[in-house]
Amino acid sequence: HFGYKEGVTKEHQKMGSRARLQKMAEDGVPFDERKFGMGQGLRPQLVNFVRSERILIKDVKMINSPFWVMHPLLCKDITVDGVTVWNEGPNGDGCDPEACENVLIQNCIFHTGDDCIAIKSGRNNDGRLWNQPSKNIIIRNCRMEDGHGGVVIGSEISGGCENVYAENCEMDSPHLERILRIKTNNCRGGLIQNIHMRKVTVGQCKEAVLKINLDYEPREACYRGFEPTVRNVSMEDVTCQKSNYGVLIIGGNKVENVYDIHVKNCKFDGVIKQPTKVTGKTRNVKFDNLIINGSLVLNKEDRPYQTYSEWLTHSEMQRVPQSYLLDFSKKPKWSYVMGIEMEGMLDTYLHYKDGKS
């Protein structure tokens, strides 16, 4: 009865129940008073555990959930093993542990209409009230196909998240948008730290291999001023054959709350738009042996020449003692050489000027 059907979601959105529910949460209305039921357009999860321990979900196939597929909430000691999720409906997340600890997700296949795995810890006031981070989570030997993200933190992450380890996974689809994704905003707040991914093989993804976004849903109606922090995130030994971006980081505008981000020993080919793009306030974003489209990505401080004028000056001073005279030489030989040299330097400047490598 509740399975996803094309077009039904849009009809339910017109009822306004979701907006009313979110307003109740923002205003601190007690849980027991947030009552909705049949005919009001809110979709349930397929599997939902609340305040439970020692949970095992094993060797089952779940299809066409109306909302999130597996959603343990405030639980401990969870194993999801050998599960296949096929759910192309909206908000069709595969597995969303929320405010949970000690979680193992392994040997699973995800084909979803939203995030494959999305780790959460409460939305805005609710998450701050619980104050229970999701922590100690291992994701391994999984395959991610369609979805908004392979391994995702957020966006309902107000209680924080720490100690997430994803390894030995395969991801590939023109409809898989990101590989490792962190999404939050200043409605949420919370501390996200110690997020690590290694040994992941990617055929293609639609947007970015690594995306950190601190300005997710900027038009959300909420009380703001709760600046989140994202720190100690690493990606190592990850390969990708096609994407629009390699690394895409959107930091905050007010505080330097994205820092200690490390991409190491990774190789991204077929990057169409931009190898790396970092905006907003960030600190210590490091690339170590990151190869994108066959070129080594240098950290800004490691580049031998920071500006076009620095390169030009150094080049000419090395070549002749009175290099300034070359600019005014009337000899055809030197005019020709300077023209080639200036053109090459200009091309290099245009390539590097926005921080590209």
Where are these regions (language model features)?
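Extracellular/periplasmic carbohydrate-active domains that bind, remodel
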Residues: 1-300
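Low-complexity, Ser/Thr/Pro/Gly-enriched N-terminal "stalk/linker" regions
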Residues: 301-357
